[in-house]
């Protein structure tokens, strides 16, 4: 495959993908290269199902092999929520800070700070050929948000084996250990090995 579509408008995700596929001889297109398109509603009950909904939609509409990701944070104190609704969870609060405060207060109340990030990437090659690659990183919720890098829940997530949040790490450092990186490396291995 010489051309692939990464079904995303998210500039930070796009940069992460481009850094991994740089110099691989594959042109990675993204939704920012095209006219604004309405993304499909993510009605799946798992990260993999939501990724497949998006990658299938991209393949159908652009007629090019497409991959998409669905990612989220799962917090034990919230019974592994927000999970697949991570983006919508942030949107229902007036600000990320309010969402973080809600999560942290539940972590303190339950005395359980365990959490993990999960990513599923689905590659849709044809209408009947879809392959899913997953990545997961365990960690814990910080007692207060720290750092200004990254996006989403990065200021409150401390990966296992580290003392700083994803948002305190450089983009390069985060991208060497992140859940998305793990899934993208599996995709890369499939495409190039």
Residue ranges and their predicted role:
Residues 2-7, 11-193:
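Anionic-ligand binding patches
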